[in-house]
């Protein structure tokens, strides 16, 4: 039962290459930085095996990018590269880029399944 546990942490618990590669959602990485685990979550492999896995996101990741534009004046907002003035507020335009990137990755994966 993997409820409440992130797929990454489940894969990180595996310490043997054969067991890691046998798992439907994990892949073994031979070369890793000091302190990193060899067995890591592999979303591509999980999708290919038909495993529905939602990767848990860290709470701080999206908040930090959203807040950097929040509360800025119009002139300052327009000068910032990742911000844009929308209506009466300064908004983070990089979120839109991230959503488009995610959509294109999903589209490419779907197209690969068709061929």
From Swiss-Prot:
Organism placement in taxonomy: Eukaryota, Discoba, Euglenozoa, Kinetoplastea, Metakinetoplastina
Signal sequence, start to end: none
UniProt KW Glycoprotein keyword: yes
Keyword Metal-binding: no
InterPro entries in the cross-refs: Variant_surf_glycoprt_trypan_C (IPR019609)
Record's protein name: Variant surface glycoprotein ANTAT 1.8
Propeptide: 93-115
Highest taxon of the lineage: Eukaryota
Lipid-bearing positions (GPI-anchor amidated aspartate): 92
Main localization of the protein described in the UniProt heading: membrane
Lipid bilayer topology: Lipid-anchor; GPI-anchor
Keywords attached to this entry: Cell membrane, Glycoprotein, GPI-anchor, Lipoprotein, Membrane, Trypanosomiasis
């Amino acid at each position: 039962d993997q409820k409440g546990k992130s797929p990454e942490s489940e894969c990180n618990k595996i310490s043997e290459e054969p067991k890691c590669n046998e798992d439907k959602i994990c892949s073994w990485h031979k070369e890793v930085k000091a302190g990193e685990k060899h067995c890591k979550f592999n979303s591509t492999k999980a999708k290919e095996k038909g495993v529905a896995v939602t990767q848990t996101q860290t709470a701080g990741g999206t908040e930090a990018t959203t807040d950097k534009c929040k509360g800025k004046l119009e002139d300052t907002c327009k000068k910032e590269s990742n911000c844009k003035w929308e209506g009466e507020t300064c908004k983070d335009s990089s979120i839109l880029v991230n959503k488009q990137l995610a959509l294109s990755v999903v589209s490419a994966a779907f197209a690969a399944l068709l061929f």
